[in-house]
């Protein structure tokens, strides 16, 4: 890792932000955002469909521009930043990894539910064999205790993962809950792999939780410029960088340049601000996967029910990523109850 930072920041505006934009990024938008983030010193930029490689589908939403084309544009634009991609085993396939690398991406981020790390083993093996840097995502990390999360992290590390992330997919973790999980992974993995943290703003704690993760030993942190992500968005990179500057943590990112990028380049590409509104708040409170927001709003409108109530019910059922279709069942259930 370069000495220009104490921690490495990955900007996920062009992947997590795809949920908020309903996967409608254009090539020009990717070119502009990558150029601005790269100029500001962001070391890693993630680019894919919101649900990762292969996510463009009837169930998750179709991409306006094929994700592999967007990856190629990002690689051609970036002068210093590395381009990363996300994939969920079973949604994306191993051939997608090969194509993304052929298009110039150099960091493979593989995500599983926090109890299913074993499904990533062959994908990490392929990525390492091909010389890609590897990152693992343990999603919905709030839903199991730290010691169980650490055991899942060990599975990823043994498979070849070089950094395992505590992923607060629902934005449900609160401060010490982040620290406890990061510390558990640091203790389990030691020098075998780094630990990272990916947060959401659904309880307004994205930056605070990210700082808690850094203090607990995390070496890689995700964020999205202008909070451009699912739910209420991710930890805003510009705010996180500002806080890091104040507490003496080096990110290698220029605060003023990233603030300009957020205002002048990223915001114009957003369909609307990512808000901590009632629906997003309910996701954080009930522990609902952040990408469910737009799906819930669509089904609530279709069936004439409350999207907030729909999300709370989804939280009680402990739905996970990939179960978005069950929102229809819940909406019908609520509709019958309100007749």
From Swiss-Prot:
Annotated catalysed reactions: (S)-4-hydroxy-2-oxopentanoate = acetaldehyde + pyruvate
Keywords assigned by UniProt, alphabetized: Aromatic hydrocarbons catabolism, Lyase, Manganese, Metal-binding
Residue ranges constituting the Pyruvate carboxyltransferase domain according to the UniProt record: 7-259
The enzyme's E.C. designation: 4.1.3.39
Active site: 19 (proton acceptor)
Group of enzyme by EC: lyase
InterPro entries in alphabetical order: 2-IPM_HCS-like (IPR050073), 4OH_2_O-val_aldolase (IPR017629), Aldolase_TIM (IPR013785), DmpG_comm (IPR012425), DRE_TIM_HOA (IPR035685), PYR_CT (IPR000891)
Binding-site list for Mn(2+): 16, 198, 200
Gene3D superfamilies the record matches: 1.10.8.60, Aldolase class I
UniProt-listed GO biological process terms: catabolic process; L-leucine biosynthetic process
GO MF assignments: 2-isopropylmalate synthase activity; 4-hydroxy-2-oxovalerate aldolase activity; manganese ion binding
Site (Transition state stabilizer): 15
Binding residues for substrate: 15-16, 169, 198, 289
Family affiliation: Belongs to the 4-hydroxy-2-oxovalerate aldolase family.
Matches recorded under HAMAP family: HOA
Name the record gives this protein: 4-hydroxy-2-oxovalerate aldolase 3
Native source organism of the sequence: Rhodococcus opacus (strain B4)
């Amino acid at each position: 890792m370069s000495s220009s930072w104490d921690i490495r920041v990955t900007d996920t505006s062009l992947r997590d932000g795809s949920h908020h934009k309903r996967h409608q990024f254009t090539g020009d938008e990717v070119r502009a955002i990558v150029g601005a983030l790269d100029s500001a010193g962001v070391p890693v930029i993630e680019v894919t469909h919101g649900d990762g490689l292969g996510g463009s589908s009837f169930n998750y939403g179709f991409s306006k521009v094929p994700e592999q084309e967007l990856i190629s544009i990002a690689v051609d634009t970036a002068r210093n930043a590395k381009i990363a991609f996300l994939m969920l085993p079973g949604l994306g396939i191993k051939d997608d990894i090969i194509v993304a690398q052929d298009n110039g991406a150099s960091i493979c981020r593989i995500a599983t539910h926090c109890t299913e790390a074993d499904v990533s083993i062959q994908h990490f093996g392929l990525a390492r064999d091909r010389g890609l840097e590897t990152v693992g995502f343990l999603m919905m990390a709030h839903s199991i205790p730290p010691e169980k999360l650490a055991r899942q992290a060990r599975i990823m590390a043994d498979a070849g993962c070089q950094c395992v992330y505590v992923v607060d997919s629902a934005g449900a973790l609160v401060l010490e809950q982040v620290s406890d999980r990061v510390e558990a992974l640091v203790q389990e993995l030691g020098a075998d792999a780094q630990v990272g943290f990916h947060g959401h703003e659904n309880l307004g704690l994205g930056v605070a939780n990210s700082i808690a993760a850094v203090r607990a030993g995390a070496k890689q942190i995700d964020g999205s410029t202008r909070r451009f992500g699912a739910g209420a968005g991710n930890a805003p990179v510009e705010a996180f960088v500002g806080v890091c500057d104040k507490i003496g943590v080096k990110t290698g990112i220029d605060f003023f340049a990233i603030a300009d990028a957020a205002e002048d380049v990223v915001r114009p590409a957003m369909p609307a601000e990512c808000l901590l509104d009632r629906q997003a708040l309910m996701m954080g409170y009930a522990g609902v996967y952040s990408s469910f927001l737009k799906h819930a709003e669509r089904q609530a409108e279709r069936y004439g029910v409350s999207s907030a109530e729909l999300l709370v019910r989804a939280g009680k059922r402990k739905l996970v990523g990939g179960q978005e279709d069950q929102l229809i069942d819940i909406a019908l259930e609520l509709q019958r109850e309100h007749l």
